[in-house]
Amino acid sequence: RQMVSHLVLDAEGKALNAKLTEAKEQGYQLNLNLLGEAVLGEAEAKSRLERTRQMLQNPLVTYASIKASSVCAQLNPWDIQGNIERLKDRLRPLYREAMKRSPHAFINMDMEEYKDLHLTIKLFTELLSEEEFLNLEAGIVLQAYLPDTFEAFRTLATFAKERREKGGAQIKIRLVKGANLS
């Protein structure tokens, strides 16, 4: 706790605003992510979603990360498109919240497990292909250690190119080492 206490803050507190102001004054932008792993129930998922939406309403918050597994409980592995539709319904309000400001707040779609890779990419590309989000710059995280990451990167690069050709905003692809190198 001592080692990371300077990195963990209450998402609604004055300490967060002080840290965000300090970072901005030093030329930094902080990526905020509510703590917690995959949610176990719908009440927890809706709570996480609402807390993220409220966080994005803070004018000092310019960058936030969210995982599909944190906003929708018990995704059905046999109904990928159904999962994606449910997730898009849940995430649209967050992306709309991000677009209310100028410049827009940045939302980074994160994922941690291999089982979420293809769903997350499909969710990200479908959501950002919707007309209302064409001008929203957003990002996605790829775990470098996953066997399908290179192909996923190529898919996302093609999507980004086609999106720009249609007049859309750019996307950011963040490649990370990954925490699960076991």
Residue locations for each model-derived region?
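Positively charged, amphipathic and often flexible ligand-engagement surfaces
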Residues: 1-182
